[in-house]
């Protein structure tokens, strides 16, 4: 069976006398095979074990030089296609962008003929939606302000508690210093007692007058 090239518009067929080599689709490597299918760009084309692409659709760097440009590299993909299969006109037409609806005319104030007063414009659905959105925004802002006020109060309470704790720590430090002084004084007193000093009364010594 003569082996044709699967590329659209390519008329090459296998001929051992021509320097054109044919390379089958890598069906055993699905990801690489999908790249080949995408490169061919043929609608509803599914390669089979007989489908192949001729060497004219590959760039020179896709071939192994040591094999005389007859074997493809592992990740080679065909990229040279002079002809592509035409698509349907419906597919070629790009979807037109949908234009936004024209803006609604501004509401016109009405005059009540019975009382001669200028009446406010009727609330259209657009106006109602804007009004509702504005209400939601105001409510969210008020809620956020209330929450911020609550957080500020909590911070103030924590600041007061911290100040009280710091004062308590300073008092305890002063008490500790006093206790250290008392202990030091008591140790000094005990050391004096151990040395055996005797405190004599003031009238123990007599004053002797020495004649001149």
Curated annotation (Swiss-Prot):
What SUPFAM superfamilies does UniProt report for this protein, alphabetically?
Glucocorticoid receptor-like (DNA-binding domain) (SSF57716)
Localization, UniProt: Nucleus, Nucleoplasm; Nucleus, PML body
Q: Where are the zinc fingers (THAP-type)?
A: 5-57
* Signal peptide from the UniProt entry: none
Q: Where is this motif: HCFC1-binding motif (HBM)?
A: 133-136
Keyword terms of this UniProt record? Cell cycle, Coiled coil, DNA-binding, Metal-binding, Nucleus, Transcription, Transcription regulation, Zinc, Zinc-finger
Q: Is rRNA processing found in the keyword set? A: no
Source domain of life: Eukaryota
Q: Which GO terms describe its biological process?
A: DNA-templated transcription; endothelial cell proliferation; regulation of DNA-templated transcription; regulation of mitotic cell cycle; regulation of transcription by RNA polymerase II
Coiled-coil region(s):
138-189
Gene3D superfamilies the record matches: THAP domain (6.20.210.20)
For this chain, one GO molecular function annotation is: sequence-specific DNA binding
Q: What is one term from the GO cellular component aspect held by the record?
A: nucleus
Query: Which family does the similarity line name?
Result: Belongs to the THAP1 family.
Q: Which PANTHER family does UniProt cross-reference here?
A: THAP DOMAIN-CONTAINING, THAP DOMAIN-CONTAINING PROTEIN 1
Its subunit composition reads:
Interacts with PAWR. Component of a THAP1/THAP3-HCFC1-OGT complex that contains, either THAP1 or THAP3, HCFC1 and OGT. Interacts with OGT. Interacts (via the HBM) with HCFC1 (via the Kelch-repeat domain); the interaction recruits HCFC1 to the RRM1 promoter.
Task: State the function annotated in the UniProt record.
Answer: DNA-binding transcription regulator that regulates endothelial cell proliferation and G1/S cell-cycle progression. Specifically binds the 5'-[AT]NTNN[GT]GGCA[AGT]-3' core DNA sequence and acts by modulating expression of pRB-E2F cell-cycle target genes, including RRM1. Component of a THAP1/THAP3-HCFC1-OGT complex that is required for the regulation of the transcriptional activity of RRM1. May also have pro-apoptotic activity by potentiating both serum-withdrawal and TNF-induced apoptosis.
Protein's name according to its UniProt entry: THAP domain-containing protein 1
What is the originating organism of this protein? Macaca fascicularis (Crab-eating macaque)
């Amino acid at each position: 069976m003569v082996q044709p090239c699967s590329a659209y518009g390519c008329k090459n067929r296998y001929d051992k006398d021509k320097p054109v080599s044919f390379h089958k689709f890598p069906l055993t490597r699905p990801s690489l095979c999908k790249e080949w299918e995408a490169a061919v760009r043929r609608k509803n084309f599914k390669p089979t074990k007989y489908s192949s692409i001729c060497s004219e659709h590959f760039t020179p760097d896709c071939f192994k030089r040591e094999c005389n440009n007859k074997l493809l590299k592992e990740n080679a993909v065909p990229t040279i296609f002079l002809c592509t299969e035409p698509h349907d006109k419906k597919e070629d037409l790009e979807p037109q962008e949908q234009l936004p609806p024209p803006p609604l005319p501004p509401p016109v104030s009405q005059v009540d003929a019975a009382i001669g007063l200028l009446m406010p414009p009727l609330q259209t659905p657009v106006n109602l939606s804007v009004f509702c959105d504005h209400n939601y925004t105001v409510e969210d802002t008020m809620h956020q302000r209330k929450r911020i006020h609550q957080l500020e109060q909590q911070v103030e309470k924590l600041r007061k508690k911290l100040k009280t704790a710091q004062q308590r720590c300073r008092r305890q430090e002063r008490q500790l210093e006093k206790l250290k002084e008392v202990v030091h004084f008591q140790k000094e007193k005990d050391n004096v007692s151990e040395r055996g000093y005797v405190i004599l009364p003031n009238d123990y010594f007599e004053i002797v007058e020495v004649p001149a």
